[in-house]
């Protein structure tokens, strides 16, 4: 006799399904953690020992991807007490996030790519999909192997590199350092079958995206491999970001930045500009500690 309970059948009934296209009201049958059937009406007795969950009036969709999360914590820019803790699995899954990319921020002194790699692997063992970027704000990049190219090529969870530009907390990298870093990430991606992307933390400097354009003029890394994030932190930067997307680049809007360009306003501007939505992503910047640099202090 077949033991159906071993398969762990679960039937989700009556949800409004987006997959991500609108599928209307559907039932979803799951076995061993995998979807095996989607239909308008799946009988609850289709298999014995099936757990039925009534989702009438609820929305069901694939898990969200958050590509900018400080998995081992962030902050520290106003002293040790402003360091934030690492992310618990439940904080991600309760928000519907099932795929995540971890990275470092300003602090790559007391936080390290090696620790981020361990956290990333732990989340994968706990059941979600997790990757990471090597590097941090600083250029040359803090890495695990001593090379951005090697990190991306041979470390399973590393898919690219991060740095900061147009920000007083950056290392003020010149175009040649940026070009070398982006080229290493690109080649590492080719060798490792990875995206090989370079993510640029954008600050509030009037230079805005100019360092990225300078990079494009001085190396042959495709614009599709360069991803500026936090582009909605000020209006001039967002205007430049729209132009960057028109040229074929991808931009990342930070959902935790409410002004001056709120995420909803940002996506409306993208649509009005006729930019393909495939060139825009949203991420949370989760667990980062945010400071307002508005007045002089002993730390200035």
Language-model features, listed with the residues they occupy:
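Divalent metal-dependent hydrolysis catalytic cores, especially in the metallo-beta-lactamase
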Residues: 87-140, 155-171, 190-205, 224-227
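Hydrophobic "anchor" residues on beta-strands that sit immediately upstream
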Residues: 9-10, 62-64, 197, 281
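Conserved small/polar residues in nucleotide/adenosyl-binding loops
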Residues: 293-300
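Metal-associated gating/positioning segment near the N- to mid-region
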Residues: 45, 50, 55-118
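Active-site core of metal-dependent hydrolases
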Residues: 169, 183-290
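Divalent metal-coordination and catalytic microenvironments
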Residues: 15, 33, 57, 68, ...
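Short amphipathic alpha-helices and their capping/turn segments at secondary-structure boundaries
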Residues: 50-51, 55-56, 147-152, 264-276
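N-terminal metal-binding scaffold of metallo-dependent hydrolase/deaminase domains
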Residues: 1-47
């Amino acid at each position: 006799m077949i033991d159906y309970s071993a398969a762990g059948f679960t039937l989700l009934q009556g949800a409004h399904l987006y997959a991500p296209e609108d599928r209307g009201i559907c039932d979803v049958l799951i076995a061993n953690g995998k979807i095996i059937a989607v239909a308008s009406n799946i009988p609850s007795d289709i298999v014995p020992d099936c757990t039925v969950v009534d989702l009438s009036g609820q929305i069901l969709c694939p898990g969200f991807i958050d590509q900018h999360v400080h998995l081992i914590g962030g902050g520290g820019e106003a002293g040790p007490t402003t360091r934030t803790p690492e992310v618990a699995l439940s904080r991600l899954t309760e928000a519907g996030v099932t795929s995540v990319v971890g990275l470092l921020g300003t602090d790559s002194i007391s936080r390290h790519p090696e620790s981020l790699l361990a956290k990333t692997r732990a989340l994968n063992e706990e059941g979600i999909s997790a990757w990471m970027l090597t590097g941090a704000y600083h250029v040359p990049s803090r890495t695990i192997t001593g090379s951005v190219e090697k990190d991306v090529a041979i470390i399973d969870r590393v898919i690219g590199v991060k740095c900061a530009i147009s920000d007083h907390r950056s290392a003020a990298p010149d175009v040649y350092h940026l070009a070398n870093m982006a080229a290493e990430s690109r080649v590492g991606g080719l060798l490792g079958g990875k995206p090989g992307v370079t993510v640029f933390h954008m600050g509030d400097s009037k230079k805005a995206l100019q360092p990225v354009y300078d990079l494009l003029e001085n190396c042959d890394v495709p614009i599709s491999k360069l991803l500026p994030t936090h582009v909605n932190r000020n209006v001039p930067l967002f205007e430049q970001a729209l132009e960057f997307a028109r040229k074929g680049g991808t931009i990342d809007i930070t959902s935790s930045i409410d002004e001056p360009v709120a995420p909803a306003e940002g996506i409306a501007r993208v649509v009005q500009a006729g930019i393909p939505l495939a060139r825009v992503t949203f991420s949370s910047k989760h667990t980062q500690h945010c400071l307002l640099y508005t007045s002089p202090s002993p730390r200035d």
